Amino acid sequence: MLEPFQILSICSFILSALHFMAWTIGHLNQIKRGVNLKIRIRNPNKETINREVSILRHSYQKEIQAKETMKEVLSDNMEILSDHIVIEGLSAEEIIKMGETVLEVEELQ
């Protein structure tokens, strides 16, 4: 039987992971909007274009790293979650798969 502290820790981890996924998706959307705005720059010179592309590339790389970190954290704790918790009829594996699917759909857009 799990102690209340263990249950609280597991729930806290799940909420943190879901918050991190939402944060990552939000930042990916910001990058997408930023790309659309950058295309509308009027009469840009080569230096401006290179600077903006560099900024976008750096932001995109940071978001990819954040996504990979999230996947590692979730997979590292998969056994703990699978053994101890089910949320609204969904297993931990199903919750993680749903989160990965959302991120993949965001990448495709």
Swiss-Prot record:
Compartments (UniProt record): Virion membrane; Host cell membrane
Keyword Phosphoprotein: yes
Membrane topology classification: Single-pass type III membrane protein
Gene3D superfamilies: 6.10.250.350
A Pfam family reported for this protein in Swiss-Prot or TrEMBL: Flu_B_M2
Biological process, per Gene Ontology: proton transmembrane transport
Membrane side Intravirion: residue ranges: 28-109
Coiled coil location: 58-83
Feature type site, description Essential for channel activity, possibly by being protonated during channel activation, and by forming the channel gate and the selective filter: 19
GO cellular component, one term: membrane
Transmembrane segment boundaries: 5-27
GO molecular function: channel activity
InterPro entries xrefs: Flu_B_M2
Residue numbers marked as site, Seems to be involved in pH gating: 23
Side Virion surface, residues: 1-4
Additional free-text comment from the UniProt record: Influenza B virus genome RNA segment 7 encodes the M1 (AC P13879) and BM2 proteins. Normal translation produces the M1 protein. The M1 termination codon overlaps the BM2 initiation codon in an overlapping stop-start pentanucleotide 5'-UAAUG-3'. Termination of M1 translation triggers reinitiation on the BM2 AUG in the +2 open reading frame.
Subunit field text: Homotetramer.
Entry function: Forms presumably a highly low-pH gated proton-selective channel. Trp-23 may function as a minimalistic gate that opens and closes the pore. When the environmental pH is lower than a threshold, the BM2 channel would be activated and selectively transport protons across the membrane from the extracellular side to the cytoplasmic side. Crucial for the uncoating process.
Protein name per Swiss-Prot or TrEMBL: Matrix protein 2
Organism: Influenza B virus (strain B/Ann Arbor/1/1966 [cold-adapted])
Gene this protein is translated from: M
